[in-house]
Amino acid sequence: MGRDSADVMIADGKNTLITVGLNDDVVDAELACYHKWKDQPRNLVAGMHGSIDQKCEAVFAYLTEHVVYKLDDAGNQYIKSPARLLQDGCGDCKSLTMFIACCLHCLGIEHIIRFVNYDGGTQYTHVYPVAIDEMGREIVLDACEKDTDGVILYDYARPSKRQKDFRLL
């Protein structure tokens, strides 16, 4: 992934999709956007080789080097395309998930978009992608989780009270 993202993906200049509604609306919008944008980073990941874990590490490292996590403004739910996320340089869990899931699709890696809740309530409060490796093992790609020193954690998921998985590819 040594390519310049500006050479391979161009944000269309339009406003990011905004959904304001019920929790299911956000889940539906995330999945609809995935199907719309899933091929967008194809040129960005072209030529990547190695095991599924090596490819996942490369995608994860690229994202965390070029984008910072930023919570959406209160009351708004933004879902950014991979190109828009890279252009803006920041996004929340929905946009980070979108970027990684689209890269996994382009690499032919089976994956899950996982919606979770940490407090036991009825609303999903976080989303992250999970890759499935050659042995069927899950590789968690939550680019929002950090250790106590602020280092983003690869292949780590905080225990959740509730989850809903959407298996893709």
Ranges and model annotations:
Residues 1-169:
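A structural boundary/capping signal
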